[in-house]
Amino acid sequence: METKIEKVLKILEEEIVAAEGCTEPIALSYAAAKARRILGTVPNKVDVFLSGNIIKNVKSVTIPNSEGMIGIEPAIAMGLIAGDDKKELMVISDTTHEQVQEVRDFLDKKLIKTHVYPGDIKLYIRLEISNGENNVLLEIKHTHTNITRILKNDKVLLSQICNDGDFNSSLTDRKVLSVKYIYDLAKTIDIDLIKPIFQKVIRYNSAIADEGLKGKYGVNIGKMILDNIEKGIYGNDVRNKAASYASAGSDARMSGCALPVMTTSGSGNQGMTASLPVIKFAAEKNLSEEELIRGLFVSHLITIHVKTNVGRLSAYCGAICAASGVAAALTFLHGGSFEMVCDAITNILGNLSGVICDGAKASCAMKISSGIYSAFDATMLALNKDVLKSGDGIVGVDIEETIRNVGELAQCGMKGTDETILGIMTK
């Protein structure tokens, strides 16, 4: 029987994984590459059935290594032509210029037909491909690489039982997670158990943030903040530097930068939000590597805990979930008590809950900067023993009730918002 610590380590392994490019289009590339390998050839007929949240998150984001292509059809074509499904979310990392031209030629044939999946599953992908002689059906539910069904010529190759109504059903049981357990474990866990994964987080995510500050990506929110620090318009402080650093990573990723990132809860933007402000804070305050890693442990697990309630994809901005993890980590690294960590999370969730997700795109970087600024405010309030009170809007009687309330808001209250956003984006 697994111990609680073993379950937590397994959760980290599931949720913190490398991915190149925004995870929703990359999930399409992965599904396409897998289906093509089973078919044996590039198909001449492709039908894809997608949930609204997948459509929303693929529509406006640049696909890495595609030489600037954007959207559903290019994401699928990249997987069909250039993908290696064995690399999972790094599926198109080795694409060549010649393969990109093949992708463009394939797209010119207009062989891909996109359909809206009518069910309630938020993350749903089904590919049906054919080469005239053989056909393959491949289905993904709930998480980006969770293949639940594969058919070839109507013969079942894979059928995985999956609870359609529970978006966490394919994952390790999250009941082990609570803010109290995360806080206590962060203080006592053997650092060698978590050092390898978080060293990789530091290395990968710092690299793309550095690139975002050097190049021209998206609306350059990260570079803009840094430039204004240097001009003396913004203060030369850790809050501004942290917002700049994390935003720069998103600027680059949303604009197709081919550098990989370590994701959190299925999202690169969440992975960067949960890590880069903490990395920058630790550097500015000369904290030890162990202190940084324990801080990252807090930020990632709080993010995962909140996202477990909110859901993989919804109308609720995932960067705000990750910003709550940042607030917890900053408070923890300041030496804050458990109560102060709870207060910091309460402050940010009481402030920014309701920020919408209207798809993956350049403006995600701006939402990340907003979340990080709020995380610093939430932290300083908590350290000063100031906190939003129970009954103030969605704030519950304790932190766990507040997190559950946020989940209810995202899953139930914002369902209509999600549908309206998709309608606006596709009209």
Swiss-Prot record:
GO biological process: L-cysteine catabolic process to pyruvate
GO MF annotation terms: L-cysteine desulfhydrase activity
Superkingdom to which the source organism belongs: Bacteria
HAMAP family listed in its UniProt record: UPF0597 (MF_01845)
Family, per entry: Belongs to the UPF0597 family.
Protein name listed in UniProt: UPF0597 protein FN1147
